[in-house]
């Protein structure tokens, strides 16, 4: 496992003791002007081709390939980060269930600094694995692990926050957990399927939840301060959260979506909100399919998505992770056009048309 930055490589061992990782996260918070400005940063394992065993519930066996790319975009400093882990249990020294890997992917979009995003990236996967109910009650484990990671970050007294979106794949099961405005989109036979909901103050359901907990929305911002209604961190902001009280208007609890993958499911795209500022769900699926049909390289596809977002005027940090469920490129899809009527001409009509054309 590594952390890579284009300006000087930093390495992090995910197998290090939890205490050491916690000590490393307790450094003094820096102002945005003091933070480095790497062009690209990622935490990733080599996930070129991790094969899954035959799943007893069906014939489809996902063949997992993942790629990733990040760019600082138009910002002065980089607050996005992400993680890709082929085998979550093995990565932390645990035995996989039935020797079947659980792969883990996460995108974390920090605000007010990068400390919260890096803390959650480094600690959330470990917290999930160390839960007593992992992996048998995965939904329950993931939900409370988000909250636990949030509470652990509060102890660092660092002043920043982060949105978080994770994807876990176990056999044919895909579990998405989201707190914030990163987004996951699935391509199913070329059709974009939204796998997460953006948690923003403009969302009616989120606005009602916030108001029921004593918060308010002012000019599109939570309590006039934040552009998201769910995030980890931000403990320094008054009126958002309170230690020991899970009922604040800013929630770290994720919304979950779980599905069973089929052969029609081609790939999953996870992106920070900078991607979705300039791409619609269907647009990014169409773009990715065309690129994969050209070269079938998942990492190059992520780079091209990020570069295209910059060309379209994206100004935020940009992160894209693509997880393909097949070794082959997506097939061409024939688009049906409703309302088109097939028409033919008789032999007599064809002769009349020829005569008419000759006489002109």
Swiss-Prot record:
Leader sequence residues: none
Residues bound to Mn(2+) 1: 109-110
UniProt keyword list: Hydrolase, Magnesium, Manganese, Metal-binding, Protein phosphatase
Protein name: Probable protein phosphatase 2C 54
Entry's EC annotation: 3.1.3.16
Family designation: Belongs to the PP2C family.
UniProt source species: Oryza sativa subsp. japonica
PANTHER family listed in its UniProt record: PROTEIN PHOSPHATASE 2C (PTHR13832), PROTEIN PHOSPHATASE 2C 54-RELATED (PTHR13832:SF531)
């Amino acid at each position: 496992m590594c952390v890579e930055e284009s300006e000087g490589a930093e390495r992090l061992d995910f197998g290090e003791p939890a205490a050491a990782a916690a000590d490393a996260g307790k450094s003094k918070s820096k102002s945005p002007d003091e933070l480095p400005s790497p062009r690209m940063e990622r935490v990733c394992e080599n996930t070129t081709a991790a094969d899954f065993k035959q799943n007893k519930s069906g014939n489809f066996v996902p063949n997992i390939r993942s790629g990733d790319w990040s760019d600082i975009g138009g910002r002065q400093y980089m607050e996005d980060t992400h993680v890709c882990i082929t085998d979550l249990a093995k990565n932390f020294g645990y035995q996989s269930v039935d020797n079947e890997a659980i792969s883990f992917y996460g995108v974390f979009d920090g605000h007010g600094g990068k400390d919260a995003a890096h803390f959650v990236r480094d600690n959330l996967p470990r917290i999930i694995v160390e839960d007593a109910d992992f992996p048998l009650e995965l939904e329950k484990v993931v939900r409370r692990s988000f909250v636990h990671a949030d509470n652990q970050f509060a102890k660092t007294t660092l002043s920043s926050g982060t949105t978080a979106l994770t994807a876990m794949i176990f056999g044919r099961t895909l579990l998405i957990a989201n707190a914030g405005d990163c987004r996951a989109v699935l391509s199913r036979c070329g059709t974009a399927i939204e796998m997460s909901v953006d948690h923003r103050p403009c969302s009616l359901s989120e606005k009602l939840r916030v108001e029921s907990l004593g918060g308010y929305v002012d000019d599109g911002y939570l309590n006039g301060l934040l552009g998201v209604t769910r995030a980890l961190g931000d403990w320094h902001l008054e009126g958002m959260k309170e230690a020991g009280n899970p009922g604040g208007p800013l929630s770290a609890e994720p919304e979950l979506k779980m599905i069973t993958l089929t052969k029609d499911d081609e790939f999953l795209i996870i992106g920070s909100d900078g991607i979705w500022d300039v791409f619609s769900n269907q647009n990014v699926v169409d773009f990715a399919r065309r690129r994969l049909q050209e070269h079938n390289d998942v990492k190059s596809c992520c780079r091209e998505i990020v570069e295209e977002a910059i060309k379209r005027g994206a100004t935020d940090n940009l992160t894209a992770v693509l997880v393909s469920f097949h070794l082959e490129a997506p097939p061409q899809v024939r688009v049906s056009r409703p309302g088109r009527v097939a028409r033919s001409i008789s032999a007599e009509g064809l002769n009349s048309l020829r005569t008419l054309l000759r006489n002109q």
